[in-house]
Amino acid sequence: MAKEIENLWREVRELSLGTKIDRFDSQPSPVKFLRNYVSQSKPCVISKAITHWPALKLWSDPAYLTGALSDDVVSLHLTPNGCADAVTGDSDLCFASAHVEKVLFPEALKVVQSSCKGLKVGYLQQQNDCFRTEYSTVALDCDGDIEWATEAFGCSPEAVNLWIGTDDSVTSFHKDHYENLYAVVSGEKHFLLLPPTDVHRLYIEQYPAANYSYHRDTDAFKLEVEEPVRHVPWSSVDPYPSPEKEASERLKFPLFFDGPKPFHCTVKAGEVLYLPSMWFHHVSQTPGDGGYTIAVNYWYDMQFDIKYAYFNFLQSLLYKSSSLNPVLSWREDEDSESSDAEIAP
């Protein structure tokens, strides 16, 4: 079966995806978007999709945001390394989630801007429709939906989320069960993308769920495994290992490093990425003039149709290859819980 799976990786690129992400200078019609991208599960970037948003000019100024949101309490996510919702690199591997505090926005933004990897990294990434709840004061600076996408999908967004971070924050490989329209307002977002067909290349394993707790008196973090133990299926691959780990990582994960290259795209301020449901994505960022990166994303319900059934069948297959060595099997145990639909860059 290994040969057939490897052929699938190549075939989807030859028949449909190509070698790079399509880009447009103007908004596509709903019909074109639905026919050429949604129906084919194919990402694209629209360069001038949100140039009319007031947020593009206003949000690069920290003084505007802290003034407009001066009395608003928001959810601040804290980690020691900028890797929330990710597999830890420690000897006792687990799926680590951030420590979350409710603080006034001006304080939260100050923590984000002063982030230092290895000590404390702040990220505003609450999800759960946070843009229309925690940040409703500035919601009118953006559109309530992506109009041509709403018409194509036939529904309004289920959730709209706001993300504010620095280059110290990284989102590990994961997938979402949503059609995602990802709009960058300030700075840049850098995406590595893999189609659902490449699921075996990400070495998804079951990891015990854990949570960081942050202690202000000592300015230190503690990682605690949840009780009772709950397992989360997550990718084991870090696509950018440190130089001292690169050789060993390549040996452990040859399907990723020796297979077809992931798609890479940079989404700049004013641009929108269409990220199809169930596509795996890893995200890093470059701050803009305000010293942070800001994005707003729109989650639309995906169709749980035949493509979803095909994906479940594919990921249930054992991958065995004498030449590449790994034996992979992904199964959701009865006590495991997939949270990937709730996590996005």
Swiss-Prot record:
Superkingdom, taxonomy of origin: Eukaryota
Cell compartments where the protein resides: Nucleus; Cytoplasm; Endoplasmic reticulum
Co-factor: note: Binds 1 Fe(2+) ion per subunit.
Pfam families attached to this UniProt entry: Cupin_8 (PF13621)
Family: Belongs to the JARID1 histone demethylase family.
Keywords: Abscisic acid signaling pathway, Brassinosteroid signaling pathway, Cytoplasm, Endoplasmic reticulum, Iron, Metal-binding, Nucleus, Oxidoreductase
Annotated S-S bridges: none
Tissue: Expressed ubiquitously including in vasculatures, leaves, siliques, roots and inflorescences. Present in the root meristem. Accumulates in cotyledons and root tips of young seedlings.
Record has Nucleus as a keyword: yes
Source organism (scientific name): Arabidopsis thaliana (Mouse-ear cress)
SUPFAM superfamilies noted in UniProt: Clavaminate synthase-like
Chain's role: Histone demethylase that demethylates 'Lys-27' (H3K27me) of histone H3 with a specific activity for H3K27me3 and H3K27me2, and involved in the regulation of gene expression. No activity on H3K27me1. Together with JMJ30, regulates the flowering-repressor FLOWERING LOCUS C (FLC) locus by removing the repressive histone modification H3 lysine 27 trimethylation (H3K27me3), especially at elevated temperatures (e.g. 29 degrees Celsius), thus preventing extreme precocious flowering.
Cofactor(s) recorded in Swiss-Prot or TrEMBL: Fe(2+)
EC number assigned by the record: 1.14.11.68
Binding site residues for Fe cation: 174, 176, 281
One GO MF term attached to the UniProt entry: histone H3K27me2/H3K27me3 demethylase activity
Protein name per its UniProtKB record: Lysine-specific demethylase JMJ32
Keyword 4Fe-4S appears in the UniProt entry: no
UniProt note: phenotype after gene disruption: No visible phenotype under normal growth conditions. Reduced abscisic acid (ABA)-mediated growth arrest during the post-germination stage, with stronger effect in plants lacking both JMJ30 and JMJ32. The double mutant missing JMJ30 and JMJ32 exhibits an early-flowering phenotype at elevated temperatures (e.g. 29 degrees Celsius), associated with increased H3K27me3 levels at the FLC locus and decreased FLC expression. The double mutant jmj30 jmj32 has longer primary roots. In jmj30-2 jmj32-1 double mutants, reduced brassinosteroids (BR) mediated repression of ABA-inducible genes (e.g.
Catalytic reaction list: N(6),N(6),N(6)-trimethyl-L-lysyl(27)-[histone H3] + 2-oxoglutarate + O2 = N(6),N(6)-dimethyl-L-lysyl(27)-[histone H3] + formaldehyde + succinate + CO2; N(6),N(6)-dimethyl-L-lysyl(27)-[histone H3] + 2-oxoglutarate + O2 = N(6)-methyl-L-lysyl(27)-[histone H3] + formaldehyde + succinate + CO2; N(6),N(6),N(6)-trimethyl-L-lysyl(27)-[histone H3] + 2 2-oxoglutarate + 2 O2 = N(6)-methyl-L-lysyl(27)-[histone H3] + 2 formaldehyde + 2 succinate + 2 CO2
One record GO biological process: regulation of abscisic acid-activated signaling pathway
GO cellular component entries: cytoplasm; endoplasmic reticulum; nucleus
Domain JmjC: 122-315
